[in-house]
């Protein structure tokens, strides 16, 4: 994408590429409501024509789609008002040795275990107070992925990551009416979940 952008006239460009895979289990009233498997990947290209800038993105990684996406960004940049602040960082300011941020902790959990954790979260929320009369459900999500950023100044770095969460939402009712409340915990490691 970067070479394509330069060959089509961009004065500079940056590309971000990401991919995520995960599962999300939802229960409602202690029964499994849905099980979703996700696999998303996309890229975004930022092009510069002098001090004019535009961004386009796609989830299609075929060469023809990359070319089409770069051309779309360049077409937009041609009609964008220049801004003196637009541009890539100076080459001497680019990070050449990025820190490892410890963001990757896959959660080895089966679908059945995710369902059980969602059931437990929902039950805990329902048991908080006798005024809690119904549930909007509980959800357990686990995701792993990777991110890469590169630019025409030679920067190319990325990192793997994980994201896990447990959510629940319940409805309480008394003589004054009804109220919805929710609880959420998330972290890069399942050990961070409350």
Task: Please identify what each model-predicted range represents.
Residues 1-194:
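Active-site bordering "gate/hinge" segments
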């Amino acid at each position: 994408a970067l070479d394509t952008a330069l060959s089509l006239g961009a004065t500079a460009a940056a590309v971000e590429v990401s991919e995520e895979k995960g599962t999300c289990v939802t229960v409602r009233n202690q029964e499994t409501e849905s099980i979703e498997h996700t696999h998303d990947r996309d890229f975004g290209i930022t092009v510069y024509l002098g001090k004019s800038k535009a961004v386009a993105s796609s989830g299609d990684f075929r060469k023809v789609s990359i070319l089409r996406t770069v051309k779309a960004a360049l077409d937009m940049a041609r009609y964008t008002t220049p801004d003196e602040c637009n541009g890539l960082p100076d080459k001497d300011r680019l990070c050449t040795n990025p820190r490892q941020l410890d963001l990757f902790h896959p959660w080895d959990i089966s679908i059945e275990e995710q369902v059980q954790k969602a059931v437990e979260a929902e039950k805990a929320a329902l048991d908080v107070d006798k005024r809690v009369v119904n549930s909007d459900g509980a959800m357990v999500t686990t995701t792993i992925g990777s991110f890469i950023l590169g630019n025409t100044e030679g920067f190319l770095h990325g990192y793997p990551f994980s994201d896990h969460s447990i959510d629940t939402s319940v409805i309480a009712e008394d003589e004054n009416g009804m109220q919805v409340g929710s609880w959420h915990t998330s972290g890069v490691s399942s050990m961070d979940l409350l």
